[in-house]
Amino acid sequence: MAVRNSPTGKKRVARSGAVSSIALSAAVPKLADSGRAGKIKTGDIPPVEPKSKKSAPRRSAKSGAATPAAESAPVPARAPEPPPIAAAVPPPLAAALAGSPEPSAPTKTQAPRGEAAASAAAQSPVGAPLPDIEALSRNIGRFVEEGGKVLAAYLSARESGEAKVGAGQEVGEIVTTLGRVAEYYASDAKRAFEAQNSLSKQFFDLWSSTLRRLGGEQVPPVAAPEPSDKRFADPEWRANPYFDFIKQAYVMTTRWADDLVKRADQLDPHTRDKAGFYLKQVTSALSPSNFLATNPELLRTTLAESGENLVRGLRMMAEDVEAGRGQLRIRQSDARKFQLGVNMAVTPGKVIFRNELMELIQYAPSTPEVLARPLLIVPPWINKFYVLDLNPEKSFVRWAVAQGLTVFVISWVNPDERLAEKGFEAYMREGIFAALEAIEAATGERDVTAIGYCVGGTLLAVTLAFMAEIGDARISSATFFAAQVDFAEAGDLKLFVDAEQLKAIERRMAEAGYLDGAEMANAFNMLRPNDLIWSYWVNNYLKGKEPTPFDLLVWNADATRMPAANHKFYLRHCYLQNDLSQGRMTIEGRALDLSKVKIPIYELAAREDHIAPAKSVFTGAKFFGGSVRYVLAGSGHIAGVVNPADKPKYQFWTGEPPKGEFSDWVAAAKETPGSWWVDWIEWVRAQGPAKVAAREPGAGKLKPLADAPGDYVRVRV
């Protein structure tokens, strides 16, 4: 039987017996209060006479604390096993944490066995049905079996040589960097004492606050998480003192550690930034929300499903380790719901040109007339181009076609070791230059307007500077989407690039011929570990839920490799040495000078971009020699760019040409609701307003090779 709340707020007791285990169970803090008052009917179970009120209470063998009298302890018809956490909590403290006002009063009526069992399930100590013991036993066996599959997937990849063996270098880098912070404090006794004293005082305040709360006071939190922190959204993180204490202790310690890093002012800025980044990885991993025993929602789910959720989760983990060839490749979306050319990248078009490095797609017109000047889009090769053509509602490509543009998009190959020697020069020659020649053959037009996105924008800037040196004027105007040409303040990715780390990356690329796409994907995920790693760890492997189908996350997981020569050049000459903006970069023996690029430029930055920070883009825009329209979009690196004109989520800011301080530009900028796409198309039309009859793919000198989105985009890592 179980304790049920009566309408008067007092507890009714079913049957006594097996006092110790049930009393402990009743004392465990409840994750959710059922809030239901139950009725107990008389049945065929003989009543138990209550003991005298003068009876001495029993004491716990472990704690010596008094427990409720035997007649106050409920005994179900089939006594359930108490949850594992029950035995770890002393009854008086646990009862206080659970908020029990007083021991239950005895009752003279008893419930029938069936109803009593249901009552016990409805009022489990953790606010969820108690697990079915038989189902739990089966699931434990299945859990062990699925765990074996995870181990088998892990080991088989290593035996076959597919897996990357060991992560000693990465771990060593983390330990070395954080060790320098520790040395900073250990080298000064006063500094170390102040740091320890600060944390001790905060914990004393937390203990005091918790005790006052257990005494019935309403007290504000000592350390509250940010309101936007979804990890602690479940009400029990605040309502239950036990979990509230764990949460606050975590938040407090995390902020204390982060402050230690920030105050280590004798470290060089790069080391301090790296330490902060690595600390963020550690604290994100150790969040109590990531563990079954310290997450109230996970405990409820596990009890309600008798552990079935953990079996499903481990099954998914085995699949993800196998898919990652011995590495855990956490799925962020259900990729089975999306198919290229069916419900992703569906804008009609044809591949009209192909070489070793790229396919060129020409999209079919949707207007009777088009601007005479075609548009060439140069996407990043770190990801795939269809982020600009996710679906009809979000597609920048489809929208640009509808505005009367003849759109061409480069789809980069997903390279293997055969393309290891393809460097920046090759991507310029066989990428942008080859595309310009193909566009002229397809349309008869020599003048082109171009867009470069992210590293595709950096390549476009390099190409424009090279074209200025050789007198090539085929690109008449250019747009940059979240692209950097100055890397002095290049954002979070710069944390991965210093002399030592670059040497390690170059060694790995020399062995394979490329940088594995999973390595780059992991780097991007580590920039937002709570959102892109640990939320899926909890959802997939602990809750046992398939992630929600989301096209953007499917694209995000569709990683690509980078040729060794190309990536080495990019990291060394851009991130490490910042050669492009400083005039030190050479291509084919020619020094590049961005000030010689005189064509009109539309420079788009995203306000919350952590990959190409808005300030960095602003600084880079000042190096060009022609007119520059700098526009600041709301949101980040992807959502700031893909902000559809028909259904905009964010705003944008416009102002004077980029000069002076970024903060001054922002203060004076004009905010406009809606999508920057509308502003951009007006700018494009102003650069070349002439129109011609619409051009169909294949109508020129180049015949179609395949339907869009082509073949190269389908090659996966």
Show where each model-derived region lies.
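Alpha/beta-hydrolase active-site loop
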Residues: 421-442
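Amphipathic, low-complexity, repeat-rich surface-exposed segments
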Residues: 2-357, 370-371, 408, 620, ...
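Catalytic histidine neighborhood in serine/cysteine hydrolases
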Residues: 571, 620, 625-643, 648-658
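Alpha/beta-hydrolase fold nucleophile elbow
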Residues: 442-455
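Short beta-strand/loop motif that positions the catalytic acidic residue
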Residues: 603-605
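Short, surface-exposed "cap/lid" segments of acyl-processing enzymes
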Residues: 325-339, 345-416
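Alpha/beta-hydrolase-fold enzymes
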Residues: 266-301, 441, 445, 463-567, ...
